[in-house]
Regions:
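Short acidic capping loops at alpha-helix termini that bridge into adjacent secondary structure
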Residues: 183-184, 215-219, 270-276
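Flexible loop/turn connectors
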Residues: 232-339
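Amphipathic helical "hinge" segments at domain boundaries
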Residues: 45-111
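Short, well-structured alpha-helical segments in soluble
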Residues: 109-121, 231-243
Length: 339
C-alpha cells in the first residue's frame, strides 16, 4: 500500500496522513492515533521521499531526455516515453514530481545533469543510455546524488540499475534463427560506446561460436547513434556484397526500418528471400508485409522498477539494487525457414 491509497481509506489528505505519521502537533492526537492504527493494519511503511510531504517539501526526480541522433525519431522516442510512463505512474502514487530537461547533444546532456543538481536542487535522478564508461555517473557520485540507471557500465560499478538482459536476448535470437536453419546471420548494432551494444555484440560472437558458426566481420556493422541515416547505406552495401546473408538482426527499430528499405530497394522479399528480426518492434511491425518479428521487453516495467528502487534504497541501507528484465520473441512472419 502507498500513502495515496492509505489517505483514501482514511478520507484524509496525503499531507495530513504524512504529518500524522511524522508526529506533527498540528494534527490532533486522535487523528494521529487513527492514522497509525490504519498504517499498522495495512502494513504501510512510509518511504523516505514521500515522507518529506510532512514538512511541506515535495521531492522531485530529475530526468534528462536526449533529443539528438536516433532520438529525434518517434521510432526511438517510443521507448523513452514508455519508460517515463512507468516512472510517472509510480511517482504519482507517492505524490512525487518528475522534472524533465531536454538535451540536443551529448555535451548539452552533461550540462543538463549539472543544471538539475546545481540550479534545480534535484537530489534524485534517473539516468538512461548508459555508456561503457559513463562520465555522468562520476558527476552524480561527486555530488553524492541518489540515482538509478537504466542500463549499466562495463565495470558494473557499485550503483543501482535496471536493464534488459542483453546477453540472454541475443542468445534467444540466435537459437531462434538457427532452429530455422539460418547460419549466415548479420547484425546491425549501434556504437559500442553504449554498454548495451557491447553486451549484445559480445553475446552475438559467443553464441555464434557456441553453435559452431564462424563469425564473418562483413556480416557485422555498428551505426553511430548520432548518425542514424547512415544505416540504410550500410545495410544496402552489406547485402549487396554478401549474397549469402539470410537473416538480419537489428539492435534498434531505426535500423530495422533501414533494413526494410534496403530489402525493398534490392527487391528482396522479407520473410521469403531474407529474414529480419528487431529489438522492440512495436513501431515498425506494420511497415512491411509480413510484419516484423521482434524481441519484446517490458520498458514500462523498467520505469516502474527504477522508481521502486529509488524509493526503497534507504530500507536496504543504501545497498545497490539491480533488476534484469527477460525478453520474449513475438513472431510476426518476417523470419523464414531456410530450406
Amino acid at each position: 500500500m502507498n500513502i495515496k491509497e492509505l489517505a483514501k481509506k482514511l478520507g484524509l489528505s496525503i499531507t495530513t496522513v504524512s504529518r500524522a505519521l511524522g508526529g506533527y502537533s498540528d494534527v490532533s492526537e486522535k487523528t494521529r492515533e487513527r492514522v497509525k492504527k490504519y498504517a499498522n493494519k495495512y502494513q504501510y511503511s512510509p518511504n523516505p521521499y514521500a515522507s518529506t510531504l510532512a514538512s511541506g517539501k515535495v521531492k522531485t526526480v530529475g530526468y534528462v531526455l536526449p533529443i539528438y541522433g536516433t532520438n529525434t525519431s518517434t521510432l526511438n522516442q517510443g521507448n523513452f516515453f514508455q519508460f517515463i510512463s512507468g516512472m510517472s505512474e509510480e511517482l504519482l502514487s507517492e505524490s512525487i514530481q518528475l522534472q524533465i530537461l531536454f538535451a540536443k547533444s551529448e555535451k548539452e546532456e552533461l550540462k543538463a545533469y549539472e543544471k538539475l543538481i546545481t540550479e534545480h536542487k534535484i537530489e534524485i535522478i534517473v539516468l538512461q543510455n548508459i555508456k561503457t564508461n559513463d562520465k555522468r555517473i562520476d558527476i552524480l557520485n561527486n555530488y553524492k546524488i541518489n540515482y538509478v540507471a537504466w542500463g549499466k557500465t562495463k565495470d558494473k560499478r557499485n550503483y543501482s540499475w535496471v536493464d534488459l538482459d542483453n546477453e540472454y536476448a541475443i542468445e534467444v535470437i540466435i537459437n531462434y534463427l538457427i532452429k530455422k536453419n539460418h547460419t549466415h546471420i548479420s547484425y546491425i548494432n549501434i556504437s559500442e560506446k553504449y554498454n548495451f551494444a557491447n553486451e549484445r555484440k559480445s553475446s552475438f560472437l559467443k553464441n555464434l561460436k557456441a553453435n559452431k558458426i564462424n563469425f564473418n566481420p562483413n556480416y557485422y556493422a555498428s551505426v553511430k547513434l548520432e548518425e542514424p541515416e547512415n544505416s540504410f547505406e550500410v545495410i544496402k552495401k552489406m547485402l549487396t556484397k554478401n549474397k549469402k546473408i539470410s537473416a538480419i538482426i537489428c539492435s534498434t527499430e531505426f535500423s530495422a526500418l533501414s533494413a526494410i528499405k534496403a530489402c525493398n530497394y534490392l527487391n528482396y522479399k522479407i520473410g521469403k528471400d531474407i529474414s529480419i528480426i528487431t529489438f522492440d518492434g512495436a513501431l515498425v511491425r506494420d511497415l512491411s508485409s509480413p510484419p516484423i518479428t521482434a524481441v519484446s521487453f517490458p520498458v514500462k516495467e523498467l520505469g516502474k522498477r527504477a522508481i521502486n528502487i529509488l524509493l526503497n534504497k534507504n530500507k536496504n541501507k543504501n545497498q545497490p539494487i539491480n533488476y534484469l528484465a527477460k525478453t520474449e520473441i513475438i513472431e510476426r512472419g518476417s523470419v523464414h525457414i531456410v530450406s
